Amino acid sequence: MDSGSSSSDSAPDCWDQVDMEAPGSAPSGDGVSSAVAEAQREPLSSAFSRQLNVNAKPFVPNVHAAEFVPSFLRGPSQPPTLPAGSGSNDETCTGAGYPQGKRMGRGAPVEPSREEPLVSLEGSNSAVTMELSEPVVENGEVEMALEESWEHSKEVSEAEPGGGSSGDSGPPEESGQEMMEEKEEIRKSKSVIVPSGAPKKEHVNVVFIGHVDAGKSTIGGQIMFLTGMVDKRTLEKYEREAKEKNRETWYLSWALDTNQEERDKGKTVEVGRAYFETERKHFTILDAPGHKSFVPNMIGGASQADLAVLVISARKGEFETGFEKGGQTREHAMLAKTAGVKHLIVLINKMDDPTVNWSIERYEECKEKLVPFLKKVGFSPKKDIHFMPCSGLTGANVKEQSDFCPWYTGLPFIPYLDNLPNFNRSIDGPIRLPIVDKYKDMGTVVLGKLESGSIFKGQQLVMMPNKHNVEVLGILSDDTETDFVAPGENLKIRLKGIEEEEILPGFILCDPSNLCHSGRTFDVQIVIIEHKSIICPGYNAVLHIHTCIEEVEITALISLVDKKSGEKSKTRPRFVKQDQVCIARLRTAGTICLETFKDFPQMGRFTLRDEGKTIAIGKVLKLVPEKD
């Protein structure tokens, strides 16, 4: 008893000190500071000195206790740690939210059975050491398997993970904490460093497009849940919050609409990003805004996409509003084609709505109206387009075949994505990474999708059009650290040699030996989609090309092109009007990066917009050198 009391003077201040103690010794005072131990020593010794073995019996219940108790009150339950309550505090930290003792302690490597210390309590000091060591080793953070710890963090309602200092926290806080733990788990799994030689799944960017309120974000959230990227408790939390705001049917979309303004109004503004995986592929969801005010944001999302999902609402009245003139269904489909999207999946959503009730007649009606328009835009109905019915809210036909539509015999949405043929990308091509965004974080970080070539850590690159030499310090592919990346991956690259202020969206990272072209004047072929009046030389618009947005002027009209024969007119036209195709010369306000459509299609297609409308789409034919 005396030796135990005297040893309490050297109570460690942190768990690292406990780690360094000799395994065989009976440690004391590892949970409270030496000052507190000094104050408590006398009352403890007088209260418990001759009653150790009697009070040792409740040891097992105390290990499983789910509430915090001050260390000096728990002393009787753990005799060997009397004077300063060392063992009791160890159990206190563990007991707060870990009924099986899953917490702190990294002590002696002894591994007796749970019953053994109870039998030998009345014995000598060796029994004391065994009793103390048993929970320490079983629960030691060093020995504990990662899977085991996460399994228990999900099963057991935890108090505070940091140290168990508030065991009396109420259920709402506990559930919120658990959700944070769940999210943390997902993040941790993504921060693993992938070796450069590891086989990678093909990366595919999927952009969800369509009229406002068609259900794009809801389907995205449903996919996240069905593929395990968002856990059930997080969704239940979103559902509770959505009900409080009288937005019950919006809760799934909150998995992608993280911005408070987006949640309050139910409108996506930015392009939401999320990831999910199937057996063969790694997908990034780009949830584009459907509202006409945010079409420029949608173009930015579509320019990074390999595959577009056009979401249509089958609800009576909603389909007509979205598809008729003024709706965004038409414009989005056209912009997706212009942005270079090859495959289009048309999801006829809200089939569970009472006005539809999984009616094959309504499904076919929507399909019949859409096909002629999509054909006109440039999609081939047989090769490029696939229609399927679904319900984003209930998840029917998203991952598994639905009983509600026995008339649909094709694959559900997620299996269909997994079975798509591979996208042929050139790993040996020139490095082209259009910049989408940039920010400061221990250096300059740029975001973008690698269109061509491959990048490795430590590589020397050039930022065009300013010709800045930069070095790659680190690479994150969808938030996973890696040393090497291939085309199609969404990257965050930390650069050395350039300031964040010197970069603009639309700049391109290139190989020093193969720079991309840049300039201000170029010849193009354009199709006038929608414009009430005629367009003459001197007309100004906004150019969207890859991730770049720039003011542009039509300086000259060179010739008209016959839509059927492709023949060019011999005389220069004085103007062009809606539905005509022409060759024109454009000049931008500033220098931009671009390539001809023939050499590099992703950087040779563009859209012209004016007064909130897409007025023309086109492709770059020739770059005109600047006159000195």
Swiss-Prot record:
Residues 1-10 have a biased composition (Low complexity). Residues 210-217 are annotated as: G1. GO terms for molecular function: GTP binding; GTPase activity. Residues 349-352 are annotated as: G4. GTP binds at D213, A214, G215, K216, S217, T218, N349, K350, M351, D352, S391, G392, L393. It comes from the Eukaryota. It catalyses: GTP + H2O = GDP + phosphate + H(+). Residues 1-44, 71-124, 146-191 are annotated as: Disordered. It is an enzyme of class 3 (hydrolase). The keyword Isomerase does not apply. InterPro entries: EFTu-like_2, G_TR_CS, GTP-eEF1A_C, P-loop_NTPase, PAM2_motif, T_Tr_GTP-bd_dom, TRAFAC_GTPase_members, Transl_B-barrel_sf. Residues 287-290 are annotated as: G3. Residues 391-393 are annotated as: G5. Residues 266-270 are annotated as: G2. Residues 201-425 form the tr-type G domain. One of its GO terms (cellular component) is cytoplasm. Its EC number is 3.6.5.-. It is found in: Cytoplasm. Belongs to the TRAFAC class translation factor GTPase superfamily. Classic translation factor GTPase family. ERF3 subfamily. This is Eukaryotic peptide chain release factor GTP-binding subunit ERF3B. The gene is GSPT2.
